[in-house]
């Protein structure tokens, strides 16, 4: 009994130590939770600053706060409020980032944000690790608690079975095992405590880093405030610019009056020019008659073109026949595919049995190798085809060098033989490839059959394995039945353990077999999937082979057709060679015509020089006025800066007032609604003003057209400047209206602030929100200022460009006027000399006229043949373009045919390179032309001998060429300007598309963000549920407080979710509104640019028309001079020398013009080749006049063609402009509708926001109450901790006193033992267990153990308990010690008197009390229950000591 009681006391000690350790763990968990909460608050305070700069993922901060704060819903409830601000701030910043590229500090800010985010991610990871550690500790705590309850139940069972002596040793062994387990768990818990301490240190370090990041964020905020100040300054500058623009408009009106006076002077000069134009028109009529003759020739050539088209149609019919044949071949291929599909179906039936993985992998590798070999063979075939083509080209070049007339027929025969041989070789190769593919397929089928046999073998092995497994299971079942029969018999504990071990082994074996079966099943499924993939690859290979055979056949047919075409082309080239000879004769006659044109061009240049001088004088006036305007604009800027500074001071005052005042959210919403209504009214007013402006523009245009009919060029310049100034006026008016709106808003805010001075600071959070909103609005205004500055800069650039263009035009006009003056002077001289020489030349002209008529006929024939050749070349080019289009269609149809496409691409690349290099025609035509060029080079050698005789004609031709090139330059410039405008229109359309794509991308990103937020909210809900579950298990002693907090959490979660949804909707709507506004602004700007460009196009077209008319007049004058030059051709040697010098100068100018005009090089090369050909036939000197006349007719025809092209292009441009206008109007209508819808939705959302704000206020009040309760609890905990520390110090003093008492008692015991050693009847071993153990040893042992227990529990844990309990325990322990000291001498004396007497009932009260204690249900889960249990035990010890003392006294009396 004594041993059992000592064991029981040891168990109590261990249980109490476990409880103390558990309490210490709870305390440490609380400390970690508080540290994590403080860290979460710091993160939440840092996160808004980060999100204000850049916040693409606003839900991250929310996730972190919820992860860190699982047990304090008060702080958790504060975080969503901050997150709302973060989301609202981040969305606007996220939208403004791509637009606000003006800030120079964006790059370092982004880098700092990235570093902070990396730190936050690290902190989140560490927090997650801490959370997992907390969860693991909680699970360990629950397991320990469960084991404690089990141990208590076992102890109670042992106490009830103390009388059974046989079960005592078994229970002692179990208790020892439990003690060992508990000690191991204590070690684990201590290790966990160490880890928690380390984690707390890490958290402190991270808090320091977060403070540094906060300081950086504060710096960023300061930078943002500075930027807002800059925006205010920009507003002041805008006001100054408006004032300056008004002054400019007044100055411009004065400038208009001056220009009108100058225009009247110019009109008088124009009347003189009109008289000259009438003379030019008469000459133009003569040229038109000659154009009629040339048109008749063109009709003849058109008939020839029709014949060639018929031949092309015949060729197309042949191609259709070949397509029918191809369809038949495809039908045969489909039949073959059906047979292949049947074979494949047979293979699929057999593939179900296949299960070997490695064999299939090897087969796939072999198949891939063979496919690669086949691809290599096909590549070799392609290389051979290309090599054959290269050989053909080399042979054709060799043949082209030989004389054509001798070896044309031999070359044809050789080509046909060589091509047929190459085609036959290619066919043989294709057939060989097909046969090789068939052999590969047959080999694969054989291998499949072999593998089927192997798979069947594997199947048999599997069945054998299954039978063995079934036998094993039968044996296991028999053994289990035997074991069950043995269990009926009475067996010891060791036998049962052996049977359980066998059962476990059997279960493990069964599980292993099941796992192996599952692995086999998965392997079989994988093999089946791989077999299906291999079959699909085989079918694809077969299809590809069929396609390749069909492609080779098509290539052969195309080559045959090309050979036939080449033979036809060679026959046609022989005809064209004869026609070229006739053309050469005609070109000689044209050389004479160019000489007369040179003289007329000189006169035109003089006239242009005079006009350019006038234009320069106008430019000087414009520049002076422009300087005045610039000075006025600078003054306006200075005024604007001063106003901006004043506005900044006012804004600073308003901000100081904002810190003192409190604004109500409902009143602000009302003001916002009123402001929106004002904005709508002002928008209508703006629309009406726009209409009035458009009407005024129309009226001004009509007035300008009536005034400025004489000089259209000057009028266009003036109208352009007026339009631009009006646009500036309209832009300035819009800016004024915006500034008036802002001023009205500021005045309204001032009035509201004066009314709200009486109220005090009640809602600090609302002020923060309002400040953020105003910051965003200031940023928007700054953005608008930047946009306006950009528009002003662009307009200034446009003005500068227009001034440059005007200067260029004036320079050209001056040059032309100078040329015209020179020509007039020369004409006067020539007329005086020609009047004298006409009489002499009349007789000679009559003889020359007959010869000229004969030569004109020859020239007409040559020109006709040359034109036919040109037309045929154009036809061939068109045919080539059609062929290219057909090839592109074939590419689209054959997307699946990869190999065929590669071959066609190679052919197309070759043809394109050859066309771009030389003549954009077929190879065979180029080679034939090379042969003609060789003949021309031989003729050039002859020309060098005759150059001395033809220098006069050559000089005249160069002068005319220079004039023609100038005309072409003018036309090319016009074409280039048109092309540039086309490119600008295309760029604008591309930019619109890019904007649309960016908008769609942003929408997709928003959707992705919404999905991510939903997922994170779901995860947060799960974690919150886990946290609440853990809190319920740990904190059962806080029942009432937890119920209140749970209710608050539920309400807050609902409000948070509703707020998040509303904030998301508001953000999305704000984003859409901003996007719509930006789109409208961009489109308005684009429309302004388009209108400007359209006006410029119209003006340039009018200028070109005027230039064409001037050139026509010049041409008429030139025709008049041709008649005089016929008669003066013999006696004008001196004048020819002058013209030679001019020709040399023009030659230098031509060399420079060739470098600048890349597009005109081809035409110049043709003209040079024709001139070189004409020089061979220029021996006849009398035919100069006739050639000049014919060449003038050709130039007229070309000019007519160019005019027609220009008109067609102008029509196209006008049609495109109209289509753009219509599209813009439609888009404007749609945007207006969308804007109305947005307004309706915004009003509905405002009402919802009001409701949410009311709910937020209620939630805030509840939060404040919860925070007050939490603060009270914190104070109570601190008070209790102080009490516990005082109790620990008192216990240390008591422990020292106890050690002293024990030393004294041990001394007394030794002295008494020595006294009673000579007693004969009893020994010390008999005395000690009877007397000393029950009273002294047991009492001292229990008292000392209680003290140590209390010391451990208090030192290990800092849990809260009452002061009274501590005082009671200390007083009771001291009283017990005093009583024991008093009872020692009496008990010793009695024991010496009655050594043989033993009292059997001395320990019955103790046993009774122990049974009573075991029967009671002690609450060890709470601190109060534990303290009650300790007090009960101390009282029981007192009672037992008193009872033992009374029993001894009774024995003495007896």
From Swiss-Prot:
UniProt keyword list: Coiled coil, Cytoplasm, Cytoskeleton, Phosphoprotein
Cellular compartment(s): Cytoplasm, Cytoskeleton, Microtubule organizing center, Centrosome, Centriolar satellite
Chain positions found as Phosphoserine: 45, 1355
Record carries keyword Phosphoprotein: yes
Gene Ontology CC terms: centriolar satellite; cytoplasm
Sections of the chain in a coiled coil: 107-138, 170-402, 438-464, 508-1309
Record bears the keyword Lyase: no
Top-rank taxon: Eukaryota
Predominant place of localization: cytoplasm
Chain positions covered by the region annotation Disordered: 828-851
Entries under PANTHER family matching the protein: COILED-COIL DOMAIN-CONTAINING PROTEIN 18, SARCOMA ANTIGEN NY-SAR-24/CYTOSKELETAL PROTEIN SOJO
Name under which the protein is recorded: Coiled-coil domain-containing protein 18
Organism, as annotated: Homo sapiens (Human)
Gene assigned in the entry: CCDC18
């Amino acid at each position: 009994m004594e041993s059992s009681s000592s064991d029981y006391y040891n168990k109590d000690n261990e249980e109490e130590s476990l409880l103390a350790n558990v309490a210490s763990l709870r305390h440490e968990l609380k400390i970690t939770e508080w540290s994590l909460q403080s860290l979460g608050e710091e993160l939440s305070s840092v996160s808004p600053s980060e999100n204000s700069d850049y916040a693409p993922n606003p839900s991250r901060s929310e996730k972190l706060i919820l992860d860190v704060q699982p047990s304090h819903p008060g702080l958790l409830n504060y975080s969503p409020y901050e997150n709302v601000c973060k989301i609202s701030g981040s969305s606007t910043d996220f939208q403004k980032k791509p637009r606000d590229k003006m800030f120079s500090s964006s790059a370092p800010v982004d880098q700092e944000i990235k570093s902070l985010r990396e730190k936050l991610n690290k902190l989140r990871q560490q927090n997650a690790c801490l959370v997992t550690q907390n969860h693991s500790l909680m699970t360990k705590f629950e397991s320990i608690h469960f084991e404690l309850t089990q141990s208590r139940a076992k102890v109670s069972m042992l106490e009830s079975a103390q009388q059974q002596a046989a079960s005592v040793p078994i229970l002692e062994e179990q208790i020892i095992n439990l003690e060992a387990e508990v000690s191991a768990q204590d070690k684990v818990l201590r290790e966990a405590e160490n880890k928690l301490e380390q984690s707390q240190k890490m958290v402190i370090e991270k808090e320091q880093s977060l403070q540094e990041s906060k300081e950086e964020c504060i710096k960023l905020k300061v930078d943002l405030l500075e930027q807002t100040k800059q925006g205010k300054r920009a507003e002041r500058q805008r006001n100054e610019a408006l004032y300056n623009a008004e002054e400019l408009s007044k100055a411009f009106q004065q400038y208009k009056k001056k220009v009108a006076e100058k225009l009247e002077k110019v009109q008088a000069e124009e009347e003189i020019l009109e008289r000259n134009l009438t003379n030019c028109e008469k000459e133009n009529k003569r040229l038109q008659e000659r154009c009629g003759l040339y048109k008749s020739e063109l009709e003849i050539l058109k008939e020839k073109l029709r014949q060639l088209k018929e031949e092309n149609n015949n060729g197309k019919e042949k191609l259709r026949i070949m397509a029918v044949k191809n369809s038949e071949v495809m039908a045969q291929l489909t039949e073959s595919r059906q047979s292949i599909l049947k074979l494949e179906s047979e293979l699929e039936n057999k593939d179900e049995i296949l299960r070997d993985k490695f064999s299939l992998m090897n087969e796939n590798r072999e198949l891939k190798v063979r496919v690669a070999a086949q691809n290599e063979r096909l590549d070799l075939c392609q290389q051979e085809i290309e090599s054959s083509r290269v050989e053909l080209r080399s042979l054709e070049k060799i043949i082209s060098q030989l004389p054509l007339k001798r070896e044309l027929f031999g070359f044809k025969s050789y080509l046909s033989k060589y091509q047929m041989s190459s085609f036959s070789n290619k066919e043989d190769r294709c057939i060989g490839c097909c046969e090789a593919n068939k052999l590969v397929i047959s080999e694969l089928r054989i291998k499949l059959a072999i593998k089927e046999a192997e798979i069947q073998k594997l199947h048999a092995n599997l069945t054998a394995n299954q039978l063995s497994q079934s036998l094993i299971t039968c044996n296991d079942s028999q053994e289990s039945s035997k074991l069950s029969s043995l269990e009926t018999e009475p067996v010891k504990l060791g036998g049962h353990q052996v049977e359980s071990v066998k059962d476990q082994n059997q279960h493990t074996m069964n599980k292993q077999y099941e796992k192996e079966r599952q692995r086999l099943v998965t392997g079989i499924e994988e093999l089946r999937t791989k077999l299906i993939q291999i079959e699909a690859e085989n079918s694809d290979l077969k299809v590809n082979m069929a396609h390749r055979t069909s492609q080779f056949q098509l290539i052969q047919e195309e080559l045959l057709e090309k050979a036939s075409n080449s033979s036809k082309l060679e026959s046609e080239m022989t005809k064209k060679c004869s026609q070229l000879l006739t053309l050469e004769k005609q070109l000689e006659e044209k050389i004479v015509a160019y000489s007369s044109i040179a003289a007329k061009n000189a006169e035109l240049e003089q006239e242009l020089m005079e006009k350019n001088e006038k234009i320069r004088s106008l430019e000087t006036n414009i520049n002076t006025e422009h300087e005045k305007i610039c000075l006025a604009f600078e003054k306006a800027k200075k005024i604007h800066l001063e106003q901006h500074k004043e506005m900044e001071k006012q804004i600073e005052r308003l901000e100081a007032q904002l810190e003192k005042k409190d604004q109500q959210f409902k009143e602000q919403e009302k003001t916002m609604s009123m402001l929106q209504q004002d904005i709508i009214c002002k928008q209508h007013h703006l629309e009406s003003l726009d209409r009035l402006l458009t009407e005024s523009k129309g009226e001004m245009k009509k007035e300008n057209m009536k005034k400025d009919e004489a000089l259209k060029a000057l009028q266009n310049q003036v109208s352009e400047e007026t339009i631009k100034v009006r646009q500036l006026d309209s832009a300035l008016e819009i800016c004024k209206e915006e500034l008036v709106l802002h001023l009205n808003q500021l005045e309204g805010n001032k009035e509201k602030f004066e009314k709200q001075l009486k109220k005090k600071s009640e809602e600090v959070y609302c002020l923060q929100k309002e400040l953020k909103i105003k910051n965003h609005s200031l940023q928007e205004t700054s953005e608008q200022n930047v946009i306006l500055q950009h528009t002003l800069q662009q307009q200034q650039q446009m003005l500068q460009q227009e001034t440059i263009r005007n200067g260029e035009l004036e320079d050209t006009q001056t040059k032309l006027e100078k040329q015209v003056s020179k020509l007039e002077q020369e004409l006067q001289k020539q007329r005086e000399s020609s009047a004298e020489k006409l009489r002499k030349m009349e007789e000679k002209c009559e003889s020359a006229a007959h010869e000229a008529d004969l030569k004109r006929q020859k020239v007409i024939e040559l020109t006709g043949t040359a034109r036919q050749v040109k037309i045929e070349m154009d036809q061939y080019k068109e045919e080539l373009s059609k062929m290219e289009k057909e090839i592109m269609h074939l590419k689209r149809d054959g997307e699946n045919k990869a190999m065929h496409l590669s071959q066609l691409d190679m052919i197309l690349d070759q043809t394109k390179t050859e066309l771009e290099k030389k003549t954009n025609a077929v190879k065979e035509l180029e080679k034939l032309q090379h042969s003609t060029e060789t003949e021309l080079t031989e003729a050039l050698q002859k020309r060098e001998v005759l150059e001395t005789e033809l220098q006069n004609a050559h000089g005249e031709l160069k002068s005319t060429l220079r004039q023609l090139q100038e005309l072409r330059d003018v036309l090319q410039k016009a074409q280039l300007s048109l092309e540039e405008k086309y490119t600008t229109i295309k760029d604008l359309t591309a930019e619109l598309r890019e904007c649309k794509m960016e908008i769609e991308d942003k929408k997709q990103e928003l959707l992705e963000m919404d999905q991510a937020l939903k997922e994170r909210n779901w995860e947060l809900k799960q974690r919150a549920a886990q946290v609440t579950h853990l809190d319920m298990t740990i904190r059962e002693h806080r029942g009432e407080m937890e119920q209140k907090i749970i209710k608050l959490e539920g309400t807050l979660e609902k409000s948070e979710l509703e707020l998040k949804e509303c904030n998301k909707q508001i953000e999305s709507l704000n984003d859409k509104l901003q996007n719509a506004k930006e789109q409208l602004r961009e489109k308005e700007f684009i429309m302004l640019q388009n209108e400007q460009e359209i006006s410029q196009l119209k003006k340039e077209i009018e200028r070109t028309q005027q230039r064409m008319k001037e050139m026509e007049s010049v041409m008429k004058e030139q025709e008049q001079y041709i008649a005089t030059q016929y008669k003066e051709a013999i006696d004008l040697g001196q004048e020819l020398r002058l013209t030679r010098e001019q020709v040399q100068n023009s030659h230098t100018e031509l060399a420079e013009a060739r470098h600048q005009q890349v597009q005109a090089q081809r035409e110049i090369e043709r003209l040079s080749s024709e001139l070189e050909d004409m020089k061979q036939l220029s021996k006849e000197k009398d035919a100069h006049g006739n050639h000049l006349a014919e060449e003038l007719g050709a130039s007229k025809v070309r000019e007519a063609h160019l005019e027609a092209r220009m008109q067609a292009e102008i029509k196209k441009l006008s049609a495109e402009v109209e289509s753009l206008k219509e599209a813009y109007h439609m888009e404007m209508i749609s945007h207006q509708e969308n804007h109305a819808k947005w307004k309706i939705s915004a009003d509905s959302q405002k009402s919802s926001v009001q409701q949410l704000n009311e709910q937020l206020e209620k939630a805030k009040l509840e939060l404040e109450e919860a925070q007050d309760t939490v603060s009270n609890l914190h104070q109570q905990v601190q008070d209790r901790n102080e009490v516990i520390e005082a109790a620990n110090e008192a216990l240390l003093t008591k422990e020292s006193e106890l050690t002293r008492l024990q030393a004294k008692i041990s001394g007394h015991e030794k002295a008494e033992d020595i006294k009673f050693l000579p007693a004969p009847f009893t020994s010390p071993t008999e005395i000690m267990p009877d007397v000393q153990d029950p009273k002294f040893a047991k009492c001292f042992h229990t008292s000392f153990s209680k003290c140590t227990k209390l010391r451990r529990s208090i030192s290990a844990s800092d849990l809260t308990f009452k002061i009274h309990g501590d005082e009671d325990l200390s007083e009771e322990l001291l009283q017990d010690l005093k009583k024991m000291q008093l009872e020692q001498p009496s008990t010793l004396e009695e024991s010496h008197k009655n050594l043989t007497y033993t009292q059997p009932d001395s320990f019955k009260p103790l046993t009774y009390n122990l049974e009573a204690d075991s029967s009671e249900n002690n609450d060890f889960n709470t601190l109060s229950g534990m303290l009650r249990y300790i007090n009960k035990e101390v009282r029981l010890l007192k009672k037992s000591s008193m009872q033992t003392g009374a029993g001894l006294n009774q024995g003495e009396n007896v």
